[in-house]
Amino acid sequence: MKIKLSPELAYVIGLWRKRRSFEGLGVKGDESLLQTFSQEALDRQLTTSDKLLTTEDKVYFYHTAYRKFFQEVEEEQLERFKYLNEYSANYLAGMFDAAGEVTEKGVVMIHRCNQQDELLFLRLGFQTRKVSDRMILERPLVFLAFIKNYVKVTKEHKVFSYLDKKKK
C-alpha cells in the first residue's frame, strides 16, 4: 500500500506529532482534540470506526503502514515542509491545535518543541525564541494568519476572529 502525503493528512500528522499516545497510532488530550483526531482519521479513511479504540483521555488505532509513514514524515519534516504552502500550513495548524497556546497578553507559543521544530519554523520565515520546551513566536499575527484557515480545535479562539476583523 503506497501512502501519499496530502494537506489533510499533514494536519493529522501535526496533531499526532505533538500529542501522540503510546498505544497504536493516536493522540492523548482533552475531548475536543480526541474528537478532532477521530473525525479526521475517519474522514481520511485511515481506519474504520470499529477499529478506533478510545479510553478516557486517548484515541488510537493500529496500522503499521500508517505508523511507519507518520514516522518517516516526522523524520523528514525539514524537507517535506520547506515551502509556505498548504502542506506546511496544515502541518503547523495540527501542531498548534495539539500543543499551541495564545496567552491573555497575546503571546503565541507552542509547547513540546525541539531543535528540529525550531529549525522548521525558521526555514519557513517565522522568527522564534525557545524557552525550555516552549517556542514563542516573535511575530504571532503573521503565523496565525498563515494557519487560520486550517486549524480545527482552536478555530473558535478570539484571536482568529480578531484576524478576520483586521483583514476587512
Where are the regions a protein language model picked out?
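Internal intein/HINT superfamily modules and their associated LAGLIDADG
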Residues: M1-K168
